[in-house]
Amino acid sequence: MSVTARIKQKSILKKKLKIDEIINLTGLSYGVSDENFRLIRDEIASHTLLYDETKPARGIELWMDNNDILLSLSLPTSPSEIKMYYDTIAKICNTLKIKKYLRDDEQVNIEDNDKFIKYDEEASIGALEDIKNKTGNAYQRFEIFGIFNPISIGQ
């Protein structure tokens, strides 16, 4: 389960932000995953991961689709990473002087980000409870990919 934001860079006359400029704007650590889902720090690719070095969780995926900026957050994740995701969206929107973006293909306003933080925190809790119910006493395990290492839940 994930949530995806699409930020449209509309202005014809303004210079468009590129991935490296977005990374610098966020102030976050970054890297890419190799074919074994290991993080290669300080690398930029078509899909780049943003994360907080002091509170690593699952990371925010950043990529471009033509001039659109896309950010994806995998759930479940930590409350601090959910907040960081919406703070990152707000930073980008404020830099572009826009108030609206697409959240899972629905147009929303950055002023509603606090509401979405709450939604995603509740969705994360729900997903963890669902995993717990599915694993129960059975010999079953779920893998959730973290920014540095996979996290195994279950037996």
Describe the predicted segments one by one.
Residues 1-155:
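Acidic (Asp/Glu-rich) sequence patches and key acidic residues
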